[in-house]
Amino acid sequence: MAVISKVTYSLYDQKEINATDIIISHVKNDDDIGTVKDGRLGAMDGALCKTCGKTELECFGHWGKVSIYKTHIVKPEFISEIIRLLNHICIHCGLLRSREPYSNDINLKELSGHALRRLKDKILSKKKSCWNSECMQPYQKISFSKKKVCFVNKLDDINVPNSLIYQKLISIHEKFWPLLEIYQYPANLFYTDYFPIPPLIIRPAISFWIDSIPKETNELTYLLGMIVKNCNLNADEQVIQKAVIEYDDIKIISNNTTSINLSYITSGKNNMIRSYIVARRKDQTARSVIGPSTSITVNEVGMPAYIRNTLTEKIFVNAFTVNKVKQLLASNQVKFYFNKRLNQLTRIRQGKFIKNKIHLLPGDWVEVAVQEYTSIIFGRQPSLHRYNVIASSIRATEGDTIKISPGIANSQNADFDGDEEWMILEQNPKAVVEQSILMYPTTLLKHDIHGAPVYGSIQDEIVAAYSLFRIQDLCLDEVLNILGKYGREFDPKGKCKFSGKDIYTYLIGEKINYPGLLKDGEIIANDVDSNFVVAMRHLSLAGLLSDHKSNVEGINFIIKSSYVFKRYLSIYGFGVTFKDLRPNSTFTNKLEAINVEKIELIKEAYAKYLKDVRDGKIVPLSKALEADYVESMLSNLTNLNIREIEEHMRQTLIDNPDNNLLKMAKAGYKVNPTELMYILGTYGQQRIDGEPAETRVLGRVLPYYLPDSKDPEGRGYILNSLTKGLTGSQYYFSMLVARSQSTDIVCETSRTGTLARKIIKKMEDMVVDGYGQVVIGNTLIKYAANYTKILGSVCKPVDLIYPDESMTWYLEISALWNKIKQGFVYSQKQKLAKKTLAPFNFLVFVKPTTEDNAIKVKDLYDMIHNVIDDVREKYFFTVSNIDFMEYIFLTHLNPSRIRITKETAITIFEKFYEKLNYTLGGGTPIGIISAQVLSEKFTQQALSSFHTTEKSGAVKQKLGFNEFNNLTNLSKNKTEIITLVSDDISKLQSVKINFEFVCLGELNPNITLRKETDRYVVDIIVNRLYIKRAEITELVVEYMIERFISFSVIVKEWGMETFIEDEDNIRFTVYLNFVEPEELNLSKFMMVLPGAANKGKISKFKIPISDYTGYDDFNQTKKLNKMTVELMNLKELGSFDLENVNVYPGVWNTYDIFGIEAARGYLCEAMLNTYGEGFDYLYQPCDLLASLLCASYEPESVNKFKFGAASTLKRATFGDNKALLNAALHKKSEPINDNSSCHFFSKVPNIGTGYYKYFIDLGLLMRMERKLSDKISSQKIKEMEETEDF
């Protein structure tokens, strides 16, 4: 099939509809001929098509038509377009609403876009009547009546016939079409002679169950039947129009309906594009529960017999396979045979006689049961990133479940508690070859962004790795027994005794070095814990091996070590019993006694405080502060438990070094002090969204406690441990948390999945070009992909070494640091980066040497400098800044840290060039990779926990998925969180006093009212401690009261005095007279006074000022003060003295003030911060997404394709159901370049292996052939001449 390079959309014209010869004229009959279920409309449900005789896989369906007897029916989706056009013309005479376009001076084809727009505005002018002297009628406003289902005159609601509108629109001369933005004949907006009946293929049945019996209906077929019925009855225009609208889009005339119609099946989540084209059900697939298998490797997948006997693979007949196919036929292993000449598929059954069908000519194929070592794609849903779907070799395994190697369980987020996986056997040989390379686990070993291995040991293998390293005094036989099948090549090197370290050296098998970890292939660390053997760790031995050699060696280490760990466990055993956890009750009894004693002390102290408040001895704290103090006391109790357990673990290790539970803790697997605290100490405070449960009826959560009880246990503090067991009320509190978490998980899964799809759709067409730049279509997004122009899985985070005077080249390093340090001090100067990005893991090639053999200091500096200059020019074209690379090499290879030979230095830089040249290929789908990594991480995060920054009643800066969602949606006109930072606290305090909301009621005033002869007197007594606590002054309180009364419309006359009652209290006396009705207005005044006498912006949040240590440099810090405030606009800060105050606005304020590039930087850092600690490696995908959102002149939401030239098909698959309608209306022509369009037209997209176009220069072959023939002919002539000489 020819490659489709361009697609044009348009509306069907009436001639095309009339051209079909399948006439539908019956509503119902016995054989369905002439009905909307006519077999001539296409093949369905196994029946061949009666028009072309093909099956439903080959027949694309045929259109029918029903006569509408010269009635004019508007195409429902274009009603608004018709109304738009009618606003430009006079409905009486059909002329445009301005005489100017008819002028002889104007040639519409020569007008500029600007002049055309001006002319169009004149047509839309507010003139009341027609300029045409023969018409002079007032202009009519036409609208569409949902009630009457027809066009009406808006003024008097009189029907306007479709035929009249049709006549007026088709009478508009073609030369005026550009002016009215008409792109095709207006008649195409109507059906006139016939209405089209679509083929059966686009009307799939909708199945449902009634009384356990499957039924199926087809609403579209029913709605088409109604149209045919009305046409046969020769019904009124409105009746047919209504039937057509109900079939096309019922929402045009009815708001609250969910009936299925054409619009429904092309929009929303389950539209036909998504269900049948973008993704659909496939043949040759299987699904089963998964289980672990120790007999298969990371590159294999175990398949049970029933799947192997059901799935079939194709073998194509050619000169190489014909003998094999004959053998398979002879041994009765062939299930199907396809004869290409006869276009016939034959099922071969036992004892079935087949005559003259099997010819075995090239192009034929046979299907046999799937064989071992065939490549098969399998995966676990949800497939959040590409490590969830891989292609491995099939192995036959026992039982009824799919078996996977435990090494890949982490990458697929799989455990073996009933998880299911699916598999699909691809039939196209090209697809099989491609998947067996690109999706093979060895290819996918290292994470695309993180760079660490995605496969590794799990569960008891981690403990085995720890124990194996510590084992001593093994004889050769014991070593060979542990190594099993891998022991044949073990070289004892004359030794008699061996340790676990020797076994690791043999397994590593390479002379590899790594600072503090490996020396010549030998582990020099004190212990082997989980960091060395599990997935997604930078110190993983498999990762270091693959950095040193290739992924093949890395995978081999995982396969061999996994086998050896399992051998070790089967020989020496490992088990954890309850006795390991709790040898006796002494420790738990001691902890319980401590907990009971401490909680009683806390309760006693709290009760004393509450009593003193009640007795008036002390002034109460604010509610938030009181809750903070109680929480801090309970936290101290929790920390006490953890300290006791840590001491207990340390003591147990001394007394019993072989305690298996503590071995697990040391190995970094499972048990930590917090988990032990839940089991042995106390279950702790139960929280919902980070807060204790809120009180409900009678000021309590559960009826187990007294009304308004302040008991911490009544708010969800569970004192008992799990060993002791929970009481009824404690169990309810734990279930309260479980209920909220399970609800959150259900909701968050849906929300994160929706955003993930949007981000992937947004970023899918972003690829690396041939120059190592990131582009989307023809738009340049980034000059250097991954900042290093090296594949993300090759780049490596390394320690950031700060300048130090003890370093060689200190001045040069210091100068470089001053150029790049801004990038490493981030998050409002609160954080200093500890890591930076190295172009590759060069540390595995660093081999220490002696002073005598080392390269000269000057030579090494020159080498680094020359290499970086060369790379800057030849690879980065001096456009991108690569100072960070020079800084890394100068610090990590610094002679003051390590001495290396000249050969080592040359090796490192040869590898550097090798990575630059060969790792990052043009077409790398960096957009999809980044989108998947971001999505996978925020999905995990949303399901694991919800966390925020502030706890002191301030506005909470949300972290996690919610905030990420807000940032990518980029909603306008919402308040933004503005952060102000300064070393001068007074400047922040002036802002705080003006903005922080404080009302009279918060100061706990004692308000009394008395009536004097001619006035009311209100006494307001306030304790000055409350005024001080609110960080305001007595004058501010006086101003608050004064301001409220002066603005009050119910007060007729007023006066005010302030008195100092005593050293603690101040009294404000207000004298009042009210307007009539006096009693009512007095009541209103007293009711609103505590809240209405206020200052600041009304908000439920306080504005506390907190201090922190800010970094100016790695060795320079200063004390800074910070506060966050919610503002709509920065203009509100305009009247304050904010000199030397750093203001960090939100994204839209950043854009308004500093422009698009600043907004990009803000978005990148804000998105990264939502992930919390330990996710610095996500900077690159966050930067890429931020760069895309800010690729135009204004930030653009992930929900929209406002600026980019997104294709119609991309919009349609994204969920825009109007995209195809608009494209057809505007007769759009588009190239087939982007992912969605390529998918639709079966074209290889320009990403990955489809980026480069491969071709053969036939002209070269022809020239070569001519040269050869010339050479041969001249040689023959020479031979003939020689012969003639004789």
UniProtKB/Swiss-Prot annotation:
Domain of life: Viruses
Compartment(s): Virion
EC number: 2.7.7.6
SUPFAM superfamilies the UniProt entry points to: beta and beta-prime subunits of DNA dependent RNA-polymerase
Catalytic activity: RNA(n) + a ribonucleoside 5'-triphosphate = RNA(n+1) + diphosphate
Main location: virion
One example of a Gene Ontology biological process annotation: DNA-templated transcription
EC class: transferase
Entry keywords, A to Z: DNA-directed RNA polymerase, Early protein, Nucleotidyltransferase, Transcription, Transferase, Virion
Gene Ontology molecular function terms on file: DNA binding; DNA-directed RNA polymerase activity
GO cellular component: DNA-directed RNA polymerase complex; virion component
Record InterPro entries: DNA-dir_RpoC_beta_prime (IPR045867), RNA_pol_asu (IPR000722), RNA_pol_N (IPR006592), RNA_pol_Rpb1_1 (IPR007080), RNA_pol_Rpb1_3 (IPR007066), RNA_pol_Rpb1_4 (IPR007083), RNA_pol_Rpb1_5 (IPR007081), RNA_pol_Rpb1_clamp_domain (IPR044893)
Similarity annotation: Belongs to the poxviridae DNA-directed RNA polymerase 147 kDa subunit family.
Functional description taken from the UniProt entry: Part of the DNA-dependent RNA polymerase which catalyzes the transcription of viral DNA into RNA using the four ribonucleoside triphosphates as substrates. Responsible for the transcription of early, intermediate and late genes. DNA-dependent RNA polymerase associates with the early transcription factor (ETF), itself composed of OPG118 and OPG133, thereby allowing the early genes transcription. Late transcription, and probably also intermediate transcription, require newly synthesized RNA polymerase.
Assembly information from the UniProt record: The DNA-dependent RNA polymerase used for intermediate and late genes expression consists of eight subunits Rpo30/OPG66, Rpo7/OPG90, Rpo22/OPG103, Rpo147/OPG105, Rpo18/OPG119, Rpo19/OPG131, Rpo132/OPG151 and Rpo35/OPG156. The same holoenzyme, with the addition of the transcription-specificity factor OPG109, is used for early gene expression.
Protein name: DNA-directed RNA polymerase 147 kDa polypeptide
Species of origin: Variola virus (isolate Human/India/Ind3/1967) (VARV)
Lineage: Viruses, Varidnaviria, Bamfordvirae, Nucleocytoviricota, Pokkesviricetes
Gene name, Swiss-Prot/TrEMBL: OPG105
